[in-house]
């Protein structure tokens, strides 16, 4: 992982942990925090916001407004991002209540997610009107390129990077090149692709 982070322009790594006791979870986060942060990448922990400070992570990613409220003590010292915002109204409330970023397009607890066109529309709407950064969850390389044309501030690349037969290095290279190219086509200027 550290060589990948050193080579690519990765803004943040979202860590989703399997269920375990708090001590084990804290140890897992601590083991990754140093190498990830040394590469200039923020380490964000999904769902376990209560472990973020103790384990040395940079912040938490939570699902929905209720979890955002429960994790509000992280702000302003730590990053607090929120996803699973199913309506425009929920997204606006998250932005008004201090979310550091909003994630659109990630699967829900049943593995369902909006269509790529619906995600693009939500990203474009948010990017044009609001200040907090928006992140597009890309399940495929094609979605990563599509969402870059929406004006999204960041693109979160999903498991396709890890499942690529060529390895994550080749998949990340392709993703960042596709993101940069699509951004240039859409906005007429190059952008350093950040995933």
Where are these regions (language model features)?
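A short, well-ordered alpha-helical element
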Residues: 1-7
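N-terminal active-site wall of soluble small-molecule enzyme domains
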Residues: 9-76, 120
């Amino acid at each position: 992982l550290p060589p990948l982070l050193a080579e690519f322009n990765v803004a943040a790594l979202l860590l989703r942990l399997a269920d375990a006791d708090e001590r084990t979870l804290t140890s897992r986060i601590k083991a990754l925090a140093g190498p990830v942060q040394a590469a200039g990448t923020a380490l964000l922990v999904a769902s376990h916001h209560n472990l973020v400070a103790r384990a040395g992570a940079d912040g938490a990613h939570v699902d929905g407004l209720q979890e955002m409220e429960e994790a509000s003590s992280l702000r302003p010292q730590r990053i607090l991002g929120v996803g699973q915002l199913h309506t425009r109204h929920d997204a606006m409330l998250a932005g008004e209540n201090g979310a550091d970023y909003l994630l659109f397009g990630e699967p829900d607890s049943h593995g369902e997610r909006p269509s790529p066109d619906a995600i693009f529309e939500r990203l474009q709407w948010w990017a044009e009107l609001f200040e907090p950064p928006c992140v597009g969850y890309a399940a495929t390389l094609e979605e990563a390129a599509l969402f870059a044309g929406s004006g999204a501030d960041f693109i979160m690349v999903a498991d396709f990077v890890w499942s690529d037969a060529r390895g994550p290095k080749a998949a990340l290279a392709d993703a960042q090149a596709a993101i940069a190219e699509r951004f240039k086509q859409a906005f007429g200027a190059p952008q350093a692709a950040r995933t």
